[in-house]
């Protein structure tokens, strides 16, 4: 049986892939993904929680939040437990795309369906990653432009 992941994570920290403050991520599927089909799962508005956290504790942007008593109690939940909504699956048709803020708490999920979940996943960092780490902007969208 399928179950929603208990917690997500933020990319860009030791043990979580690349070590950089991610600006944007993208997820798209090559096949339709139905509920329980291994979808990308995200915690709505968790990027705002993470932004507030790093504004309050800028010295923890390098991942030292994982060395705190709060981390020992809540793990990645420090970025998602207090959100306004429960996590959601990105259930979508082939070719649909979700662009997500780099501080959005997210996870993969188990595929209990007969159809494979095949997708493309991309992540981008700011060209001045070190500068972004030194100065967390007041607006979480400060470095974004369309």
Positions of PLM-derived features:
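Conserved double-stranded beta-helix
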Residues: 1-42, 47
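Glycine-rich, charged/polar anion/phosphate-binding loops
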Residues: 10-13, 27-28, 84-86, 104-107
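A general structural signal for short secondary-structure junctions and capping/turn motifs
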Residues: 13-20, 32-33, 89-91, 96, ...
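Glycine-rich loops and low-complexity Gly/Arg-rich segments
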Residues: 15-19, 32, 50-55, 65-69, ...
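Intrinsic-disorder/low-complexity, polar/charged segments enriched in Ser/Thr/Lys/Arg/Asp/Glu/Gln
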Residues: 23-25, 87, 97, 119
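Double-stranded beta-helix
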Residues: 33-105
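Non-heme Fe(II)/2-oxoglutarate
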Residues: 55-60, 94-99, 103-146
């Amino acid at each position: 049986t399928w179950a929603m992941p208990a917690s997500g994570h933020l990319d860009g920290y030791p043990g979580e892939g690349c070590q950089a403050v991610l600006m944007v991520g993208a997820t798209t599927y090559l096949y339709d993904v139905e509920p329980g089909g291994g979808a990308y799962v995200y915690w709505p508005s968790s990027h705002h929680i993470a932004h507030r956290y790093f504004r309050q504790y800028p010295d923890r942007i390098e991942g030292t939040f994982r060395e705190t008593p709060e981390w020992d109690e809540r793990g990645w939940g420090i970025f998602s437990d207090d959100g306004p909504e429960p996590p959601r699956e990105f259930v979508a048709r082939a070719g649909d795309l979700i662009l997500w803020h780099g501080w959005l708490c997210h996870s993969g999920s188990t595929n209990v369906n007969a159809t494979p979940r095949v997708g493309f996943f991309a992540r981008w960092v700011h060209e001045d990653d070190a500068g972004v780490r030194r100065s967390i902007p007041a607006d979480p969208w400060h470095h974004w432009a369309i």
